[in-house]
């Protein structure tokens, strides 16, 4: 039976940390891309967006000037 020493465990945790960071970055990129696409699709109709969930409120307001 082979036992892992502390060096093996720390290498495992370092690889796992890189793995989780990679997926967190991919998730953040997906959220940003979704928000960007949503705003491009609804840019003419979107002036204000409110999201209420529990104690959290997210409010987005677009401020722009009309072209002359």
Curated annotation (Swiss-Prot):
UniProt entry tagged with the keyword Magnesium: no
Protein name: Protein SrnB
Biological role stated in the UniProt entry: Toxic component of a type I toxin-antitoxin (TA) system. Its normal function is believed to be effective plasmid stabilization through postsegregational killing of cells that have lost the F plasmid. Promotes degradation of stable RNA in E.coli.
Keyword Cell inner membrane carried by entry: yes
GO cellular component, one term: plasma membrane
Membrane topology: Single-pass membrane protein
Pfam families on file: HOK_GEF
Gene source species: Escherichia coli (strain K12)
Transmembrane feature ranges: 23-42
Family: Belongs to the Hok/Gef family.
Keywords, ordered alphabetically: Cell inner membrane, Cell membrane, Membrane, Plasmid, Toxin-antitoxin system, Transmembrane, Transmembrane helix
Domain of life of the source: Bacteria
Cellular localisation: Cell inner membrane
PROSITE patterns: HOK_GEF
InterPro entries: Hok/gef_toxin, Hok/gef_toxin_CS
């Amino acid at each position: 039976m082979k036992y892992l020493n502390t060096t093996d465990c720390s290498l495992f945790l370092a690889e796992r940390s890189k793995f989780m960071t990679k997926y967190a970055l991919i998730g953040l990129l997906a959220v940003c891309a979704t928000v960007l696409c949503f705003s491009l699709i609804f840019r003419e109709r979107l002036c204000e967006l409110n999201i209420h969930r529990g104690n959290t409120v997210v409010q987005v307001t677009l401020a722009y000037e009309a072209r002359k």
